[in-house]
């Protein structure tokens, strides 16, 4: 998407006009204009020259963002968002108010309340009129922008809010000038009655008051709109301006734009990390709250990644730059927030269509109103006042701002809490989700095996069991071994050196320690070599039913104990799932694990449905099936989740994830917390509710205000509306809409107390993708391989990947509990190749059947 700066827009009708003009350019596939940020996003093959020309022909200015430099600095981008409008409006308002007070003194103070005037004004009605003409003229010159913009838009046949203001004010002024000249004629003729009558036809104060009140509203609106971009501006302010890099062994401070990939930079305690990088020397605690919203510092050491704008709280670190400029995490976040602001939510299209015809319709109504009152026998001044009231009370901005201000504030709220909506569409649609599909590994669980249980045999301590396992597993490369090593190291245990280490077929290890033979492995492996007490055997079975992998250890033929390892559920996962269910959302867990393990983990997490045996390539088809039953959000963090994230109605990438997952997602959660999923949906619902409130107010205001201004209720109730009060109402309408949107800043996205409890959907029925294919492919050869050595889901995934790569099979299903790998092939497969493939993956084949 190419971004453009747009100048000259003043209301929703302007943005609608620009969008319509650019959409007609050949090669443009989509265009969205943001009145809040005065920007435009365009997709397609059209040249920037054609696009800019189209904008200019519509009566506005345009320039391609970053066209003058290869890279726009963060300070320049920040400057572009600065509120330059409010100070200018404030100066205009102060000057206008000063002259308006004097004008009101002359026009109403003397006549209504008898306030004193200089003697030369006594009975000098022409002088009174000339003073009012002069003062009103000065105020019109001060607020000339309304007239320039309004009549320019009218000339281009795209009238906007400024056109309504300019027409209303100018009509009052022109009629008053006519009345002044007519009064001078009457005074020359000595017709004092006519003179007094024409004095009552002066609307100079209305012409000036309309402009002043609209300026008040514009200033309040600009101030409020400025606050809607606070989140984006605060993100930009986080970007460091300089970096300290090492060149020839010397520290040199350079502008951030000069840092290149591969440069080595240093960061002292209290300083911000300038760019994304990897620590090559030193340790520290890094405060990443700027990016993730998480206030607790994260310990970092050599080899760990650091991100721009995070704060080094302790320790001197030396880092190598890996991402600079627009590639840093901070820059990508800012780009996502900016792009979201430049897109339009589907609900905004209603307001856009209305805004496009609103101003011409209002002008037509004003003309008809004036004519009708003239035809009913009223004086021209009275009829004109009704028409002017219609012009100045009508507010297209209230309609046009209803959606974008809420989207901008909601998006900013999300960004402050580490929740990034990539488009306005994703912010609107996330709240409509009915089914949430969660990838198990890395989403519900931590993604890394951990030690969960230590069960020593009689007479053996936990420390003794863990030390022995530590010594035995230290030389193993298995993922489960790493879990035991990490647990032991966290307890500051020391592993004695073993000799004669062997990885044995059938899920086992052996070694010698102090002339004692140590063995470890699966239940099946150990039970074939030593006697396992019935109590421990039952306990191992219970652990397996809970989705854990029991590892047994023996010394000199006697069982020492059991260590259970599992990919544990994240601390906040059950609560997050419960919150989703309370919101009326059905939660489904997708996993490649076998049915038994999947059911155990699903029960612990509290999900509604479990779909087991789902291959990486099968997630997309499962999502397609779920979409037939409701609007689906897919939550994942890996490369193999990308197709499913794309297929879902809303794709949510959780945690740091991968670049591919982030690219495929609609919503990016910076933290690895599942609780941010209900928070994102909650924020979406609150934003959508706010939009509905804004649209209701905007339509209600115009529906009630225009008939009142036109005088519809005069024959019934005698209600009339002075043009000045109409202008005041117009000023406040947009302000009310923007202020209502700003209430979202007070919304607590993690507060589940006010969640609307919707009746849950009916049970979800999704057939296992493998079973579907098995039925469809009865003519295929089913290959069942007996495999020794698989101990967990990680082993299964390893074997699946090896078989898939070697034979092109798409439906490989492995089970470490059954020690089998099953897949289908169009014809019988070379069994020697199967054995070689499995052996190369680190496992042994004990049998093959093909049928």
Predicted feature locations:
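Conserved cytosolic catalytic loops of P-type ATPases
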Residues: 26-43, 48-49, 201-202, 233-327, ...
């Amino acid at each position: 998407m190419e971004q453009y700066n747009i100048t000259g827009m003043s209301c929703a009708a302007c943005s609608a006009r620009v969008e319509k003009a650019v959409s007609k350019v050949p090669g443009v596939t989509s265009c969205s204009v943001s009145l809040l940020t005065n920007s435009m996003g365009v997709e397609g093959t059209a040249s920037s020259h054609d696009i800019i020309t189209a904008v200019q022909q519509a009566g506005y200015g345009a320039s391609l963002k970053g066209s003058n430099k290869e890279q726009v600095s963060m300070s320049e981008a920040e400057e572009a968002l600065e509120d330059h409008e409010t100070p200018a409006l404030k100066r205009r308002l102060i000057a206008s108010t000063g002259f308006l007070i004097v004008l009101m003194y002359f026009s109403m103070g003397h006549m209504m309340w008898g306030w004193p005037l200089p003697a030369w004004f006594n009975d000098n009605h022409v002088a009174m009129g000339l003073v009012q003409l002069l003062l009103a003229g000065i105020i019109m010159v001060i607020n000339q922008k309304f007239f320039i913009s309004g009549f320019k838009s009218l000339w281009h046949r795209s009238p906007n809010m400024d056109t309504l203001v300019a027409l209303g004010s100018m009509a009052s002024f022109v009629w008053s000038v006519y009345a002044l000249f007519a009064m001078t004629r009457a005074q020359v003729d000595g017709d004092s009655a006519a003179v007094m009558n024409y004095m009552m036809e002066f609307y100079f104060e209305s012409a000036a008051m309309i402009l002043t009140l609209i300026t008040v509203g514009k200033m309040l609106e600009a101030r409020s709109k400025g606050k809607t971009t606070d989140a984006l501006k605060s993100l930009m302010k986080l970007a460091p301006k300089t970096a300290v890099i090492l060149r020839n062994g010397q520290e040199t401070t350079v502008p951030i734009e000069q840092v290149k990939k591969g440069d080595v930079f240093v960061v002292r305690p209290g300083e911000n990390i300038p760019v994304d990088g990897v620590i090559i020397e030193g340790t520290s605690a890094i405060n990443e709250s700027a990016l993730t919203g998480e206030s607790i510092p994260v310990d970092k050491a050599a080899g760990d990644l650091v991100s721009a704008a995070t704060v080094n709280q302790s320790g001197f670190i030396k880092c190598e730059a890996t991402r600079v400029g627009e590639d840093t995490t901070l820059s990508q976040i800012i780009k996502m927030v900016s792009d979201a602001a430049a897109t339009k939510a589907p609900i905004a299209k209603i307001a856009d269509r209305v805004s496009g015809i609103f101003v011409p319709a209002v002008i037509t109504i004003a003309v008809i109103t004036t004519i009708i009152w003239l035809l009913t026998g009223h004086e021209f001044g009275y009829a004109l006042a009704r028409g002017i009231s219609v012009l100045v009370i009508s507010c297209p901005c209230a309609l046009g701002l209803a959606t974008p201000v809420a989207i901008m504030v909601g998006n900013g709220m999300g960004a402050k809490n580490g929740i990034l909506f990539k488009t306005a569409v994703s912010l609107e649609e996330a709240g409509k989700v009915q089914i949430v599909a969660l990838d198990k590994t890395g989403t519900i669980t931590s993604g890394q095996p951990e030690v969960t249980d230590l069960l020593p045999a009689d007479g053996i301590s936990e420390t003794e069991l863990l030390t022995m396992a530590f010594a035995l597993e230290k030389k193993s490369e298995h993922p489960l071994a790493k879990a035991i090593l990490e647990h032991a190291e966290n307890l500051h245990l020391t592993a004695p050196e073993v000799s004669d280490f062997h990885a044995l077929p059938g899920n086992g290890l052996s070694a010698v320690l102090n002339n004692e033979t140590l063995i470890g492995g699966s239940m099946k492996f150990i039970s074939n070599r030593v006697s396992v007490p019935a109590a421990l055997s039952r306990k191992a079975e219970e652990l397996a039913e809970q989705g854990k992998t029991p590892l047994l250890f023996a010394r000199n033929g006697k069982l020492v104990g059991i260590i259970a390892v599992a990919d544990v559920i994240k601390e906040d996962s059950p609560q997050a799932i419960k919150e989703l269910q309370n919101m009326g959302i059905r939660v489904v867990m997708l996993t490649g694990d076998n049915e038994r393990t999947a059911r155990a983990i699903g029960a612990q997490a509290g999900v509604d449905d479990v779909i087991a045996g789902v291959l990486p390539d099968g997630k997309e088809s499962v999502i397609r099936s779920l979409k037939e039953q409701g609007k689906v959000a897919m939550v994942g963090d890996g490369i193999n989740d990308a197709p499913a994230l794309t297929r879902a109605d809303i794709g949510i990438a959780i945690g740091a994830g991968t670049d591919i997952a982030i690219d495929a997602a609609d919503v990016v959660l910076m933290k690895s917390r599942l609780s941010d999923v209900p928070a994102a949906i909650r924020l979406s619902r609150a934003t959508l509710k706010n939009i509905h409130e804004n649209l209701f107010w905007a339509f209600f205001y115009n529906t009630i205000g225009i008939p009142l201004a036109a005088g519809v209720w005069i024959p019934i109730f005698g209600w009339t509306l002075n043009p000045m009060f109409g202008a005041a109402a117009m000023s406040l309408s947009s302000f009310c809409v923007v202020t209502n949107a700003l209430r979202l800043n007070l919304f607590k996205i993690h507060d589940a107390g006010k969640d609307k409890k919707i009746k849950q959907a009916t049970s979800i029925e999704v057939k296992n993708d493998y079973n579907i294919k098995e039925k469809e492919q009865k003519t295929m050869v089913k290959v069942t391989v007996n495999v020794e050595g698989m101990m967990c889901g990680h082993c299964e995934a390893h074997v699946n990947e090896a078989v898939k790569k070697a034979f092109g099979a798409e439906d490989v299903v492995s089970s470490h509990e059954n020690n089998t790998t099953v897949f289908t092939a169009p014809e019988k497969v070379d069994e020697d190749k199967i054995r070689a493939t499995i052996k190369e993956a680190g496992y042994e084949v004990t049998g093959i059947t093909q049928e």
